[in-house]
Curated annotation (Swiss-Prot):
It holds the Pfam family PITH. The gene is Txnl1. GO terms for cellular component: cytoplasm; cytosol; nucleus; proteasome complex. InterPro entries: Galactose-bd-like_sf, PITH_dom, PITH_dom_sf, Thioredoxin-like_sf, Thioredoxin_CS, Thioredoxin_domain. Its main location: cytoplasm. It comes from the Eukaryota. It comes from Rattus norvegicus. One of its GO terms (molecular function) is disulfide oxidoreductase activity. CDD domains: TRX_family (cd02947). This is Thioredoxin-like protein 1. Gene3D superfamilies: Glutaredoxin (3.40.30.10), PITH domain (2.60.120.470).
Length: 289
């Protein structure tokens, strides 16, 4: 949908989010007579046309008081970011440049508006929920670092001194993991034996990873690491995941180094809202906290 769509009443809000599906939804909370809201309105409208892969909604806090209270809106303009009806971020104020940077940041992580047909109904690509600042990769090469495997392009992650990699992936809220995609080249450098650990209290080293019992161990085939491959996880063991550590022990062809073209997780957020955003108790209209 191109353009900003006003949300007329509280009952209309959730259906609009549902309609956005896995696409990024940017919701502007505004108020009639609010100067900063009026100032940023032309830029917000322009962004809705510039980024047609996202959905842009506008909510008046007086018309939709229930929606504003549920989302803990204390000032206008406030911009909330949703995906699959899950609140993933927010931005406050009338700085159009800062808002656009935030939108671009989330669209860079966009798994694509064309939903993968191999993702089961009810699950989603969790790439937008990965907290890149909390990620770490040991034994990555200087030329081909970790960030490369979070992008669907020709770049790749490659190990440095030997074939092993130790990757920690942090999420910005608890998630349930159903499966993962683990793509690699067909030249023998793709990953083979992988140990998965979750919610470790601290970073582990290679020696610890070798001797520790994983949450799940994988033996990947060449088919598993193709572009359309899906690697199932033991869903019951991945019900409340804040971080995942992947120990890549070896590759398909016993090559000197291992390459990973792309990986992501398939699953769902544990809850439809990030409770860290709801620490403030919503008071009566006009009260400040």
């Amino acid at each position: 949908m191109v353009g900003v769509k006003p949300v007329g009443s509280d009952p209309d809000f959730q259906p609009e989010l549902s309609g956005a599906g896995s696409r990024l939804a940017v919701v502007k909370f505004t108020m009639r007579g609010c100067g900063p809201c009026l100032r940023i309105a032309p830029a917000f409208s322009s962004m809705s046309n510039k980024y047609p892969q996202a959905v842009f909604l506008e909510v008046d806090v007086h018309q939709c008081q229930g929606t504003a209270a549920t989302n803990n809106i204390s000032a206008t303009p406030t911009f909330l970011f949703f995906r699959n009806k899950v609140r993933i971020d927010q931005y406050q104020g009338a700085d159009a440049v800062g808002l656009e940077e935030k939108i671009k940041q989330h669209l860079e992580n966009d798994p694509g508006s064309n939903e993968d047909t191999d993702i089961p109904k009810g699950y989603m690509d969790l790439m937008p929920f990965i907290n890149k600042a909390g990620c770490e990769c040991l034994n990555e090469s200087d030329e081909h670092g970790f960030d490369n495997c979070l992008r669907k392009d020709l770049s790749f992650l490659e190990s440095d001194c030997d074939e092993q990699l130790l990757i920690t992936v942090a999420f910005n809220q608890p998630v349930k993991l159903y499966s993962m995609k683990f793509q690699g080249p067909d030249n023998g450098q793709g990953p083979k034996y992988v140990k998965i650990f979750i919610n470790l209290p601290r970073s582990m080293d290679f020696e610890e990873a070798e001797r520790s019992e994983p949450t799940q161990a994988l033996e990947l085939t060449e088919d598993d690491i193709k572009e359309d491959g899906i690697v199932p996880l033991r869903y019951v063991k991945f019900q409340n995941v804040n971080s995942v550590t992947l120990f890549v022990q070896s590759n398909q062809g016993e090559e000197e180094t291992t390459r990973i073209s792309y990986f992501t997780f398939i699953g769902t957020p544990v809850q439809a809202t990030n409770m860290n955003d709801f620490k403030r108790v919503v008071g009566k209209k006009g009260e400040s906290h």
